[in-house]
């Protein structure tokens, strides 16, 4: 039993890393008042772009950078439609998800079944990697796993302990008041949404370059939707996002580990989404949203009064 739990934990961390990247970015985007339902499209485009660039150049780090950039570019498109044009944020995000899924399928046809030109391998940390049990459990992962973990305290500190973090939160709570104090609401929202897209792209890149080093059409398998629920589960807090991402990562791992026990694979495939629906149901309603700390101006377009 102990071995089973340890084996699940060992895989849950890399499995949850794409979710962690996406959630950290979405926390910042929503803290600015912008909901991004295009995360799924940005992640899948990050996955195909990262794999394609790595395949073309043989340099996996160029693939990582390309994955992040394509996520950021798609996010800028979302920012333009939802912040500048003030289009409904749900419609804009859903459109980007459909665009990403369709475009990635078209671009990825040539890479189906192709072996990766390079991949992000595990990095061992001196002394720490040799620790009994803990060494293999926490200190033998690819570089993006460590980057995601390092970003958690950094982003928490920026959000709660810096002037820019206060500015970001004020824009998400009361953009009119922030504007009256001289804050450029549009610029802050653009930056937050762009950052969210970069993180989503990194999450997709991790999928195709490290966790499952290959291109598989639709390989995000709904990860972007889980990110939306995780953002609520984390109560828009980077530290809680770490716990939630690895929890959902463990649930996804259980899909495969429990199949030998005779449990229906269809039921197991539903597990992450059952949890997602439960989180969304628990957060439904204006009273509950306020209680769990949802940004007051989330999904509210802002037009400066002349």
Language-model-detected regions and their locations in the chain:
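Transmembrane helix-bundle core of multi-pass membrane transporters
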Residues: 100-161, 263-268, 295-306
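Hydrophobic core segments of alpha-helical transmembrane domains in multi-pass membrane transport
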Residues: 22, 47-51, 101-105, 147-156, ...
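Single transmembrane alpha-helix segments in multi-pass membrane proteins
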Residues: 7-56, 64, 69, 73-90, ...
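Loop-to-transmembrane alpha-helix initiation sites
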Residues: 89-91, 117-121, 140-147, 189, ...
């Amino acid at each position: 039993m102990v071995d089973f739990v340890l084996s699940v934990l060992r895989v849950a961390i890399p499995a949850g890393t794409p979710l962690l990247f996406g959630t950290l970015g979405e926390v910042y985007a929503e803290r600015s008042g912008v909901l991004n339902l295009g995360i799924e499209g940005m992640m899948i485009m990050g996955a195909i772009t990262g794999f394609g660039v790595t395949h073309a150049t043989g340099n996996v780090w160029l693939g990582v950078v390309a994955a992040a950039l394509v996520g950021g570019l798609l996010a800028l498109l979302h920012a333009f439609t939802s912040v500048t044009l003030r289009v409904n944020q749900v419609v804009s995000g859903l459109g980007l998800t459909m665009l990403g899924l369709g475009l990635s399928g078209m671009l990825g046809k040539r890479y189906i079944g192709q072996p990766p030109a390079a991949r992000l391998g595990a990095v061992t940390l001196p002394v720490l990697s040799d620790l009994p049990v803990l060494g293999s459990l926490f200190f033998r992962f690819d570089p993006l796993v460590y980057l995601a973990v390092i970003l958690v305290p950094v982003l928490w500190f920026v959000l709660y302990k810096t002037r820019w973090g206060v500015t970001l939160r004020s824009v998400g709570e009361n953009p009119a008041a922030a504007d009256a104090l001289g804050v450029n609401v549009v610029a802050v929202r653009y930056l937050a949404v762009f950052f969210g897209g970069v993180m989503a792209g990194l999450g997709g890149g991790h999928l195709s370059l490290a966790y499952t080093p290959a291109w598989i059409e639709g390989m995000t398998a709904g990860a972007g939707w889980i990110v939306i629920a995780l953002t609520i589960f984390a109560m828009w807090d980077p530290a809680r996002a770490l716990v939630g991402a690895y929890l959902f990562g463990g649930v996804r791992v259980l899909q495969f580990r429990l199949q030998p026990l005779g449990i229906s694979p269809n039921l197991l495939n539903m597990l992450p989404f059952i949890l997602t629906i439960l989180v969304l149901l628990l957060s439904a309603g204006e009273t509950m949203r306020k209680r769990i700390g949802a940004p007051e101006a989330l999904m509210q377009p802002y037009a400066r009064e002349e």
